[in-house]
Amino acid sequence: MDKKKLSHSSLQSSVTSVLAALLCILIGLIVGFLVLLAINPAHAWGDGFVRILKGGFHDAPYGVGKELANAAPLVMTGLSVAFAFKTGLFNIGAAGQYTLGAYGALYCAIMLKMPWFVCLLAATLLGGIWGAIPGFFKAYFNINEVITSIMFNWIGLYLVNELVYQNGTGPMYDVRNTRTLNLSKNPAFAQSIIPDFGLNKMFQTNSTTIAIFLAAAVAILIWVVLNKTTFGYELKAVGLNKSAARYAGINEKKNIILSMAIAGALAGFGAGLYFLSNVSQWNPLNSTSLPAMGFNGISVALLASSNPIGTIFSALFISHISVGGSFLSTKYYPTEISDLISGIIIYLCAFSMLFRGKIHGLLFKNADKTNVNAEPAPAKTETEMEGK
């Protein structure tokens, strides 16, 4: 009976979380449309709102392929933030971990000419190491992981830029394009590019690979680890109450470091998916801004309520409206309008707890009441009482 009640409660929680996220999206889109009206009323509907809603389908199949290529790293950075949050930590250092992952993947591809899966492993390893450092400071010195991870974002950016650029003489650096060497333009790097299995032809792009399927598989794996394994239970127990976890014999210091290391590894893996799909090349001259994928991962995790499976769908949605925004005519609207709508939706996600409470009250108010018609538990007999 207890298991049945627990399962029913979990189902209610999942339903309310999904509906709350959909409500956030709906309100965000409405507010976004009002902004479009305020900027340019004449083109707010057809050339603005509808084009954003169509996303990549406005220029299918190319646009859809672009959505999938951008969604893969978003799933991973969203997982990075969500995993840490599930274990009681806030990983705002996904951008730095993503940066180190990008370097690991590109170094293995360009300098060592390794197969793509080895390059992905290097990206995962470097991201994990970079994530473990704030975890170490949190575990042994109780230094807030938000502060240390922000600092390591910038340290990672400048370190990677210097390693790639080397005053313009770096072996990974293409002086003419001011970026790392393009993997697709050199046959020597062919084995380092993630295979597409015909997806590039299907979507008429050069960057649509199996990356999105790899990201989805990792998301499912993380859900299984968190919900179906003893290791996942220990991680969540430490996040909920370190003192209680310690009393239960769980090594909270080890688990804090592991949580941040895994979160960093996920972000690094996402960078590998992005750069080994040849979506873009690394620009070491960009020293003023961190990779947007890292911070967009926070948006993905918030919209998904930190559910690993939910990050797949929230990443696809964020990618969808971002690509839709890129198709807006600059005569009428700035391309950043899609980022504005995303920001509004994520801002509303801060109220998702309120929305979930209201939705739960509307849908399940009768289900939560005690069933007065249920048979009461049988009373103990005098013999049973005396036996005690």
Question: What do the predicted segments below correspond to?
Answer:
Residues M1-I25, A38, L240, Y247, ...:
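Cytosolic-side transmembrane-helix boundaries in multi-pass membrane proteins
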Residues D2-M76:
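Membrane-interfacial amphipathic/re-entrant helices at transmembrane-helix boundaries
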Residues A20-L37, L74-V81, A102, L106-C108, ...:
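Hydrophobic core segments of alpha-helical transmembrane domains in multi-pass membrane transport
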Residues L36-L37, G55-M111, T124-I143, A244, ...:
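Single transmembrane alpha-helix segments in multi-pass membrane proteins
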Residues F83-G104, L226, F231-E234, S329-P334, ...:
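Cytoplasmic juxtamembrane regions at transmembrane-helix boundaries
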Residues N153-N227:
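Transmembrane helix-bundle core of multi-pass membrane transporters
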Residues L266-G268, L273-G343:
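Transmembrane alpha-helical segments in multi-pass inner-membrane proteins
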